[in-house]
């Protein structure tokens, strides 16, 4: 039984998590079982295309990417998907191609947008007493 070379990576944004399985194939990219061309909303579809367009479609010609995304809203999911795809491509090139092409990919991604490879660490601030939220306070009366 021959095993297909594959890597598994993830991307996160807020509470959205995308897991990408990258393996040798013929250039298919699927998100939750449907082609990448059907990602909704349409305006954010180009955000998902960014990793593909940055390095050229020739890098994706001989690999298949399957992405499963859960949690969060539409925008968070799109950012998690693009991060998972970018990280998956870098990991695949590191493991199965060569170190030089991996470094070229990393350089291209980080020079364009750092969040393609590094997760956004911002999280909601916890609520404190004396107000309705993290920073807002209840109204104060002097009389």
Swiss-Prot record:
Query: What are the entry keywords?
Result: Ribonucleoprotein, Ribosomal protein
Segments for region (Disordered): 123-143
- Keyword Transport in annotation: no
Here the segments flagged for biased composition (Basic residues) are 134-143
What's a GO cellular component annotated to this UniProt protein? Answer: cytosolic small ribosomal subunit
- Molecular-function GO terms, alphabetical: RNA binding; structural constituent of ribosome
One biological-process term from Gene Ontology?
translation
Similarity remark = Belongs to the universal ribosomal protein uS9 family.
- What is the protein's given name? Small ribosomal subunit protein uS9
Tell me the organism. Answer: Kluyveromyces lactis (strain ATCC 8585 / CBS 2359 / DSM 70799 / NBRC 1267 / NRRL Y-1140 / WM37) (Yeast)
